[in-house]
Amino acid sequence: MTLSKAIKFSLGVFPIFLQLSCIEAGASPIKTNGNGDPTDVGIWYCANWDANGGGWWPMASYRPLLPDGSYGMHDGSDVAVIDFHLQKLAEAQIDFILFDDTNGDFNGYGPQNVWIKEKSKAVCARIKLWNRSHSWKIKYAFAIGSFMIGDREYPTATSYDVIEQQARCVAQEVFLNSDYDTNDYYQIDGKPLLVVLDYNKDARTRWANHPSGKAWANRFAIRWAGTSGGYSVAAGDYGWAMNAAGVLLHPEVEYLQPGHDNHLPAGAGWMHTLRKNGDYYVNNWDRILGNPLPRIVMIGAFNDYTEDSAVWTADTSVDYPKSRLPIERWQGHDVQLHPSMYWDYTVGIIRTLRHGAPKPIMAGSAPASGGAADRRHP
């Protein structure tokens, strides 16, 4: 065999080996453009923050860590903050972020929210620069909504054509736009990922039966969120709120959160999920790592401070008037505040997933028992 043929052969064998590794792990053999590990890690990302306390800040009593070491509010398109986030995401070895543009941001379905997609696109521009000069690549994808069909707050959303039209906008404004790099968009089997938030259990069937054109949507790998009813996650969904059953095992994607909407009154329903001093997050990761790994682990969320699901470092010591209260303080079992407890755990547990490192200890908790978690891929 000549050297050139040997090289071609080895290049051909590697994708097959990677695919077989995923099959042995129980993962779906889908192909992605992540960083090459058998399991990719994605995380929801919110850009819906405006300068001087605008945007969705009035609803949030969380104040995230800023590049200068202080805690406070920031603009979703602030270059220094975006670059800081990208640095931390890369250090954590997260493969892609999923933009929350579910509130009619594209095609003007929610005119009051159009500004949010512009903030998201500002992050895309910084990712283009980041990926040019860093070995760990950060990809991105977009989440849109079809939940608003028939909602009087979204008068132009009248049918499942909303998916086609938002897909067209994402393609034209981002994926095919030369201001960005198509290689930076997270892809599944060669198609850019587009997640659709819908609260109907039969959302997939409704979309499949929609009679209008789907030329733009067919260019995407369409996936779903919230289809267990009432926005809770079903098996194979990429979000939204966790089902009461906890992590739902699935070969393609498994979704987990540290908590969700814990400002709501106890007993308010599925959306009220307490963090329990970090135990809820730890237990969710234990379930993922104790079973054959999926192709994608999806975390909700990096910085969703309005629905109480963030893991990025934040100060939770103050209740700001007129925000969504009460929030659940980020305390360990030692009853001390630990602003970075969820981010530190996220970084550590991804090392366990990828490299078999010992499980991290949640801040303020007793040491984890045993050594490395049970990893079911080679």
Q: Which residues fall in each region the model found?
A:
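Bacterial N-terminal signal peptides that target proteins for export
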Residues: 1-11
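Coiled-coil-like amphipathic alpha-helices with heptad-repeat character
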Residues: 3, 14, 370-372
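Bacterial N-terminal signal peptides
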Residues: 10-21
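Enriched but not universal
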Residues: 22-28, 362-378
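Glycan-processing catalytic domains of CAZymes
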Residues: 28-364
